[in-house]
């Protein structure tokens, strides 16, 4: 059996799908526990689908940022997270308004409340994305270092064998 992160693409899709499925189940359980009606399911499904899609876009952008200079990586990532939180919060607030306040205008306090939870959610997603990717980078560098050390040891042993060759003496 190969290590989980050997196929980085497969690992990403498995973690992405499992994470958002868990989020969906958690939100649904929270709604059921709070006694809300079944109409609550629709905004939760839309929210999870929007979050899944937004984090796919974030992942594609982060993939291009991760190899840049640190200031570009972290500055760009911060901007992307802020834009993603704004978009995700607007979708959540709009969906909640559509389902629960038919015909009501945009509610700024609902948007700000959504910003809080979505900042935590997308910030955690980003931290996991970078944490896992930096772990993979360090593992690859460790493997490369071990291979180089092995080559150096082999070269030293070959040199020693050559020096101890009786024909050399």
Protein language model features and the residues they cover:
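Cytosolic signal-transmission helices at domain junctions
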Residues: 130-162
């Amino acid at each position: 059996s190969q290590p989980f992160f050997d196929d980085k693409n497969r690992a990403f899709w498995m973690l992405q799908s499992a994470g958002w499925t868990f989020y969906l189940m958690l939100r649904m359980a929270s709604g059921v526990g709070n006694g809300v009606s079944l109409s609550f399911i629709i905004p939760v499904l839309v929210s999870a689908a929007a979050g899944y899609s937004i984090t796919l876009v974030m992942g594609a952008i982060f993939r291009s940022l991760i190899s840049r200079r640190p200031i570009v990586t972290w500055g760009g990532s911060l901007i992307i997270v802020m834009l993603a939180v704004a978009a995700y919060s607007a979708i959540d607030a709009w969906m909640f308004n559509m389902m629960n306040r038919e015909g009501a205008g945009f509610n700024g306090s609902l948007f700000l409340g959504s910003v809080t939870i979505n900042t935590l959610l997308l910030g955690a997603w980003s931290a996991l994305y970078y944490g896992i990717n930096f772990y993979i980078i360090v593992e690859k560098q460790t493997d490369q270092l071990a291979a180089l050390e092995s080559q150096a040891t082999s070269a030293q042993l070959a040199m020693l064998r050559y020096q101890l060759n009786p024909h050399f003496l």
